[in-house]
Swiss-Prot record:
Record's keyword terms, sorted: Phosphoprotein
Pfam families (UniProt xref): DUF719
Feature: compositional bias, Basic and acidic residues: 19-34
InterPro entries the record matches: DUF719 (IPR007998)
Organism per entry: Mus musculus
Lineage, highest ranks first: Eukaryota, Metazoa, Chordata, Craniata, Vertebrata
Entry similarity comment: Belongs to the FAM114 family.
Descriptive protein name: Protein FAM114A2
Length: 497
């Protein structure tokens, strides 16, 4: 080495001091040691400044890539993470609501199909489409929105969708309920009647009128229907004005009962006790004792009945007379005597004739005639009896002077009621005798139902007469109170005289 060449060690230390580390920060210079630098160390090649900057740039890029990779591995806790989570939650909520709507539709599908209700699939499709459009429009804003705002949006979407599904389901169920009630009402003719009876108490006249209206509404395009109408008790009872008189009697009884309650509420003390005692005595008369029909002797003629019923009406001291009732009763017994003589004549004619078919047809027709006339006679006698009770009640209420007491009138009316019921029982026996005589050659399956029907209608007729008699109780109670008031007002006047 020559003396002109510069020393190598200072050059190496100078270059090293200008280098930077990978972070482009100057490296601290190590402390100088007292030991000499080895002269045999190879001198590193010096690089230009451009090469130094190029080597530092890749180091920075690699450092940034490393940091990004590390950030992916670490769980995110910033605002960006809430966007993807909210989107997933909204999709799950929409799918759940759609499933609920589909479940409701499946539940009512059978009822809708049977009742003809429109299918709710269109409503469900519109709900799903609206939820999808709303989700698509809100996805962009949810990525940058705050978590609380996102939750509010989800709640609104779920609430609106749920309201649509639930309201649609409730409307469908309400329509199903109304349609079901209509179908039940159409399939059950007694549904409306049952509903009406639950709201009010039916009276005897209402029951009879409903039965008559129901019979009139039946189709009459068959011969059997016409025959049934001839033997229908309700239609015949209304034909003889029995239903009208029964309704009028019920009205008078109801008005009288209201007056009795009003008068009793205005009384007090001893006067109230005395009035109640008298009313109880009057009420005991209306308690009809059970009578035995077998002990009743059969009537031999019409004169006895007419005389007895006329005498009873005379004791009432009213202007009405039982002529119509007596005439209807005499007509019935006269027809019975004629029908009893007819089978004997037909039997004699049948022996002379060679054909037995004509005799059987005549006997069969005779049974139908007897049955029809029996029902008609029972309805007519019952209607006439109720008409007499109605007229008696009107005359008692509007009579100017009471010649007999209310207690005496109640006793007379009670005897009359028992007499009418026994006569109806006797009349039904006469009709069954006619049926048995005319249907000797008939089978029991044909004759027994007809006889049973006659006895049944006779029992119903007696019940109707007894019910009409009970309607007279409030009328006679008012009569008793009025007579007592008149007597109390007449006593001071007689004392003054």
């Amino acid at each position: 080495m020559s003396d002109k060449d510069p020393p190598e060690s200072p050059v190496v230390t100078g270059v090293a001091s200008t280098l930077k580390d990978e972070n482009c920060e100057p490296v601290e210079k190590p402390e100088d040691k007292s030991q000499p630098v080895v002269s045999t160390r190879k001198r590193p090649e010096t690089k230009p400044s451009s090469d130094l900057e190029a080597s530092a740039l890749p180091a920075q890029v690699s450092l940034a890539v490393a940091k990004e990779t590390a950030s992916k591995d670490v769980p995110q806790t910033g605002w960006g993470y809430w966007g993807s989570w909210g989107k997933s939650l909204l999709s799950s909520a929409s799918a759940t609501v759609a499933t609920v709507g589909q479940g409701i539709s499946n539940v009512i599908e059978k009822a809708e199909t049977s009742l003809g209700i429109p299918s709710p699939t269109e409503i469900s499709a519109e709900v799903k489409q609206a939820a999808g459009e709303k989700n698509a429009g809100e996805n962009g804003s949810l990525l940058v929105a705050a978590p609380f705002g996102m939750l509010s949006t989800i709640s609104t979407a779920v609430q609106s969708t749920g309201k649509s599904v639930i309201s649609g389901g409730l409307d469908a169920l309400e329509f199903i309920g109304k349609k079901t009630m209509d179908v039940i009402a159409e399939g059950d003719p007694g549904f409306k009647r049952t509903k009406g009876l639950m709201n009010r108490t039916s009276t005897l006249s209402q029951v009879l009128r409903e039965a008559k209206d129901k019979e009139e509404q039946r189709p009459s395009n068959e011969v059997t229907m016409e025959t049934d109408k001839k033997t229908h008790y309700g239609l015949l009872f209304d034909e003889f004005q029995g239903l009208s008189h029964l309704e009028a009697l019920e009205m008078l009884s109801r008005e009288s009962e209201i007056k009795v309650k009003s008068i009793l509420s205005s009384l007090s003390g001893e006067e109230l006790q005395t009035t109640r005692l008298e009313l109880e005595q009057l009420k005991e008369v209306f308690s009809l004792a059970e009578f035995c029909e077998e002990e009743e002797e059969e009537r031999q003629g019409d004169d006895n009945f007419t005389k007895e019923i006329t005498d009873l009406f005379a004791q009432l001291h009213v202007s009405s007379r039982p002529e119509k009732l007596a005439r209807a009763r005499n007509t019935a017994y006269k027809w019975i005597r004629t029908s009893l003589a007819r089978p004997v004549a037909e039997k004699e004619e049948g022996e002379k004739e060679s054909e037995a078919g004509n005799t059987e047809e005549a006997q069969k027709h005779s049974i139908e005639d007897i049955h029809a006339f029996a029902i008609r006679s029972l309805a007519e006698l019952t209607a006439c009896s109720i008409e007499l009770f109605h007229k008696t009640a009107a005359l008692v209420l509007h009579g100017q002077k009471q010649e007999v007491t209310a207690l005496e009138r109640s006793q007379t009316l009670s005897q009359m009621t028992v007499m009418l019921c026994k006569d109806l029982a006797s009349l039904s026996k006469e009709f069954t005798t006619c049926l048995t005589t005319a249907g000797v050659r008939e089978k029991a399956d044909v004759l027994n139902p007809v006889i049973t029907a006659v006895f049944l209608e006779a029992s119903n007729s007696a019940s109707y007469i007894q019910d009409a008699f009970q309607l007279l109780l409030p009328v006679l109670q008012i009569s008793l109170i009025e007579s007592k008031t008149e007597s109390s007002t007449c006593e001071p006047q007689s004392r003054d005289l």
